[in-house]
Regions:
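Short beta-strand scaffold segments in enzyme catalytic cores
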Residues: 19-26
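Short loop/turn segments at strand-loop or loop-helix junctions that form parts
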Residues: 10, 35-38, 98
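Acidic helix/loop or adjacent segment enriched in Glu/Asp that either coordinates divalent metal
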Residues: 48-83
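Short, function-defining helix-loop hinge/capping sites that tune catalysis or transport
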Residues: 16-17, 103
Length: 172
C-alpha cells in the first residue's frame, strides 16, 4: 500500500507569529504544529553565532538557507511522528505544496537523506512539488493551526517540537 504524505504551511514566513506546518497522512490524519517563538528565538541565536554549519555566497543566501533547513526540519519532525504512529511503510509518496518558499531541491534532498534508511523503497521521484486545491482538508487544517482553533485542534495530532532535535537536523 502507498502512504501519501501531503505537506503545507499556513503563514507567509517561518519567523512570523502563528506560522504553522501541516502534514496530512492518506488524506485523513492531520499532524501539525504552530512553531513556538521560543524555539524560533533559540535557533536564530544559534544561527547568528555561526553554530549551524550553514554556508552561502552571502549573508542573505545563508539566511535563506537557514530558513529552508528550519522549515524542512519541522517537516521531518512531523513525518517522524506519523511514521512512528503508522509503523512499517511499504511505499511512500510525498507531496509538498508549491507555496512553501525556498529551494525545492534542497527540501527534497533533506527529506530523502533523512528517510531512505527508514523507508528503503523511497526514491527521489516520490517527493514532488504540487498545488493543493482550495478549499481542501489540508488548507483548512493549516488555518486551524494558525488560528489556534482549540475545538478543531482536538481532531488533529499536535506535535511538540524539540529545539535540540531541530538544531541537529538543520546542522546535518
Amino acid at each position: 500500500m502507498i502512504t501519501l504524505f501531503q505537506i503545507d504551511k499556513s503563514g507567509s514566513d517561518i519567523f512570523e507569529k502563528d506560522y504553522s506546518v501541516i502534514l496530512l497522512v492518506n488524506k485523513k490524519e492531520i499532524y501539525g504544529t504552530n512553531i513556538p517563538q521560543k524555539i524560533k528565538d533559540e535557533l536564530v541565536s544559534k544561527f547568528k553565532k555561526g553554530e549551524m554549519k550553514i554556508t552561502g555566497t552571502s549573508e542573505k543566501a545563508k539566511k535563506n538557507r537557514f530558513r529552508i533547513r528550519f522549515h524542512t526540519a519541522i517537516i521531518i519532525s512531523l513525518m517522524e511522528q506519523a511514521i512512528k504512529d503508522l509503523g512499517y511503510l511499504d511505499d511512500v509518496n510525498i507531496e509538498i505544496c508549491n507555496d512553501i518558499d525556498g529551494h525545492f531541491h534542497e527540501i527534497k534532498y533533506m527529506l530523502f537523506k533523512q528517510f531512505t534508511k527508514l523507508i528503503p523503497s523511497l526514491k527521489l521521484e516520490d517527493i514532488v512539488l504540487t498545488k493543493f486545491q482550495k478549499p481542501s482538508l489540508i488548507d483548512d487544517a493549516g488555518k486551524t493551526f494558525r488560528k489556534n482553533d482549540k475545538e478543531k485542534l482536538k481532531e488533529c495530532i499536535q506535535i511538540a517540537l524539540n529545539t535540540e532535535r531541530l538544531y541537529n537536523i538543520i546542522r546535518k
